[in-house]
């Protein structure tokens, strides 16, 4: 019924959408497709530099296949990776003993969810030397071959893992390490040493970069291509696997590669921070800020759900009241949310003078207030609708079932200006201009 009603309400939009996507094939043209044939690239060096800068690596390979460019690649020396899958208590204790001898530990958690307040730990990888790593499995498929089923005493596994993070003099390295620390805290494990986040360091060095994913950082700084996660879990969609469903040998290598690459990135990024005289900002501002954000995210935000519901009901009635006022001006009912229907009402039926062609944007409605009171009611309608749909109804859906609080994520690497941003949900974009918003 919902889909049927949506189709009925948006019939005008559907016909317009069809018209917009229909290719017009009856045009008179004076050129042929051969006129647009791509024959050569004059400035090949700049093309290669540009696609590298914008991380468009697939374009280079396509151009090479078409023989438009030839990239001279030195043969890469592939180093042997010493990644160990921990399968029993003896291997676990030996690994922990080896790890604790180092004062620099890079680690990465494999989990079941991108939300740190609900994710379960699938396994943990740790590296203290380049091209080396240990993977400690926690969750894994039940249909494993008998030779590789872990025989670890899992009753005290987190007490064992806690030893690794109980070293105040140790530097702990990670990619988006805030996420991992939040999960470990939920499991009763505190990371007590100093911290280095490769993602934050890369953002500080280049705040306008398109992506700070470790795959891209690895290519740029290490000239090393990591295993794409899609190779393990498949593309996004209903058939995508969980990390806990991946064979141990595959997830072990993938996870160790993450902690290994983060360790190698640390050396280069820390050197670059010093070179650009950004190390003080990183260690005295960014990392302390991250620690505060960890506490804020973990604590969460308490909201009065009953108040949200009551206010949502009130705003719902306000929306109905404003809708009736709008219809009283037009003497006809229409879909207020349809830009096409609204523009027809404003400019054809009521005869208002268009400000920006037939736009019905907020700034246009502000101008139209001078011509007709319907514009004021339309602005009220949009304001109330946004309050109800985006905030009053949406924010309570983010309540954590165990804490009954909202645990938003504060991000240091999204805005190029350095300001914090908030996601899932966004708590920084709540309107406060009107009395009811406040």
Annotate each language-model stretch with its function.
Residues 88-92, 153-158, 177, 247:
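Amphipathic coiled-coil/heptad-repeat helices and related helical stalk/stem segments
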Residues 180-188:
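Short Gly/Thr/Asp-enriched flexible loops that form oxyanion-binding sites at enzyme active sites
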Residues 106-108, 157-163, 196:
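Catalytic cores of nucleotide-enabled group-transfer and carboxylate-activating enzymes in metabolic
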Residues 6, 10-147, 209, 217, ...:
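Conserved "right-hand" nucleotidyltransferase catalytic core of DNA-directed polymerases
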Residues 190-207, 214:
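Conserved beta-strand -> loop -> alpha-helix junction used to position metal-binding or nucleic-acid-contacting
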Residues 151-169:
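Short, basic/hydrophobic alpha-helical segments
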Residues 178-181, 200, 209, 341:
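Conserved nucleotide-binding/hydrolysis micro-motifs of P-loop NTPases
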